[in-house]
A protein has these predicted regions:
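Conserved core segment of the aminotransferase class I/II
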Residues: 7, 33-37, 123, 127, ...
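Conserved core of the PLP fold type I
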Residues: 105-244, 256-278, 284, 372, ...
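N-terminal mitochondrial targeting presequence
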Residues: 1-24
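Short beta-strand
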Residues: 78-80, 286, 369-375
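Conserved glycine-rich beta-strand-loop-beta hairpin in the small C-terminal domain of fold type I
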Residues: 349-360, 370-387
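N-terminal small-domain helix-loop-helix segment of the aminotransferase-like
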Residues: 30-149, 336-340, 464, 471-473, ...
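PLP-dependent enzyme catalytic core of the Aspartate aminotransferase-like
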Residues: 126, 279, 406-415, 420-481
Length: 481
């Protein structure tokens, strides 16, 4: 074959799929909503070399579907309870005002270090020592901190520097882990299903069992997205003792400030308190300005861990993301004064607990049992089968995908629970997923948005029960065949 012939065969692929599509179950075939979901995650590649499924996951998929019904043109007219973002305005009593402009020094015009500027790294280390390591001999320094352009960039850097590893992760958990775990071939992902019956608790003996089976890395959010629970201090210390010298523990602590269990006194949650030696314990902590400082647009986050890990993470930044924005790094330094942060966390906890209680109360009024009230984060992990009395079968909105789809008619966005069933190989039948009958609701937005969203949920439930004049067949909700 000539070289030109080979070139044509590459540039003009046949219409056949690059990989044979999996066979759908009868349940999935009968549901158009589920077929749409599969179409977004599997199928042919319209462009050579492009895997389009990686561009449509989790919140992005939900936003794309909402945009088909007008969300992109008028986002302020929607109640977006899907995106995991806290309200970013200055309206929270007791919270410090966010900068409306920042100075740009001459140094900030240059490339910054890929591990972050030293003053910010030192400020993060001081914050952790003041809040979690008082009286301990081993203290964090700037060399134990790597600044990264957002939490997901931090996770990608961590994944890039891991050796060939079995990595265990609980189900359910943060949806973005799914793509990260499937992207890196040095990682063999091992799911660790948790039980709804005991509140998705991560038991220390289960961690010991996973390590005994050969797990070298463990990854989890704590506090936990989407369930709103967390592993408490004593049990987390036990887990860290089990992992010490045996496995690397990665703790995604972005919701550590949203703690409602200590009477909103500003106490935050972190595994840093249980680290014995900051350079020997293989514990990586990820946090940043995004959630608890309510600055998601700044894209300033950090990883705290042993110096050798931090050195490798800084090197990975040179070929992955180039590092975080220097002017925003400089502006972040005064925000990390330990006493200021304590006061900020107290204000945050009081405000978001009030919103949590409002949302839980409204959901109970609508008919959801709400036996499982979140201890942390700003999420409700809503069991659609907990409605009392149950919905009639013909309503067909007792699974997360169809419930999400029905809410589009009310300009309300939630995230179907299926996205938190981390399933990198995409083998599982959607109807077999333990997360299939859940949705995640965020009470991150302002109160008026929460009220609007819950009003929309109530109307959908009433319509499903036949309690409104509007027929169920509307112009948005997709009907099953």
């Amino acid at each position: 074959m000539s070289f030109s012939g080979r070139r044509v065969s590459i540039l003009r692929p046949r219409n056949a799929s690059l990989s044979a599509p999996r066979g759908l179950s009868d349940n999935e075939l009968r549901s158009e909503t589920h077929r749409q979901f599969r179409d977004a995650h599997e199928g042919h590649r319209p462009h050579a070399g492009l895997d389009a499924s990686r561009a449509s996951t989790g919140v992005v998929w939900c936003t794309e579907r909402a945009s088909e019904h007008g969300y992109a043109e008028d986002p302020s007219g929607w109640a977006n309870l899907g995106q995991g973002a806290p309200e970013a305005d200055d309206g929270i009593e007791g919270s410090f005002p966010r900068p409306e402009s920042i100075p740009i020094t001459s140094a900030a015009r240059e490339y910054g270090p890929t591990a972050g500027i030293k003053p910010l790294r030192a400020a993060v280390a001081r914050l952790y020592n003041e809040h979690y390591r008082q009286g301990k001999e081993s203290q964090y320094t700037w060399e134990n901190v790597c600044i990264v352009p957002g939490g997901r960039a931090g996770l990608i850097r961590i994944a890039a520097i891991l050796g060939n590893s079995y990595l265990s992760f609980p189900i359910p958990d943060y949806s973005a882990y799914n793509e990260m775990l499937s992207l890196f071939k040095n990682i063999a992902p091992i799911p660790m299903p948790l039980s709804q019956n005991d509140g998705y608790h991560i038991h220390a003996d289960k961690i010991a069992e996973e390590i005994a089976r050969g797990t070298q890395v463990l990854l989890t959010s704590n506090p936990r997205n989407p369930t709103g629970h967390f592993v408490g201090h004593d049990e987390l210390a036990q887990i860290q003792d089990i992992c010490r010298d045996r496995a690397t523990l990665i703790l995604d602590e972005f919701y550590g400030g949203y703690n409602y269990t200590t009477d909103c006194d500003g106490t935050t949650i972190s595994g840093a308190e249980n680290v014995v030696d900051v350079n020997q314990d293989d514990v990586l902590l990820i946090d940043g300005l995004t959630k608890r400082f309510r600055l998601p647009g700044w894209r300033i986050a950090w990883i705290v861990g042993p110096k050798e890990f931090v050195d490798a993470l800084g090197s990975a930044g040179s070929y992955l993301d180039g590092g975080a924005n220097v002017p925003f790094q400089e502006a972040a330094i005064p925000m990390l004064d330990p006493s200021l942060v304590r006061a900020e966390m107290k204000a945050l906890q009081v405000h978001f607990r009030e919103k949590r209680d409002f949302v839980v109360g409204r959901l109970r009024e609508i008919g959801f049992r709400m036996d499982d009230v979140p201890q942390a984060t700003f999420y409700i992990w809503l069991d659609l089968t907990s409605l009392d009395p149950p919905l009639p079968p013909q309503a067909n909105i007792s699974d997360g995908l169809n419930f999400f789809n029905a809410l589009l008619s009310e300009k309300v966005i939630v995230v179907p629970g299926i996205f938190f069933d981390l399933n990198p190989a995409k083998r599982r039948d959607l109807f077999d997923s333990p997360c299939h009958h859940f949705v995640r609701l965020s009470y991150g937005p302002k109160m008026d948005v929460l009220k609007s969203g819950l009003d929309g949920i109530e109307r959908v439930i009433k319509r499903a029960r036949g309690q409104t004049e509007k027929p169920w067949e509307d112009d948005v909700a997709v009907q099953d065949d």
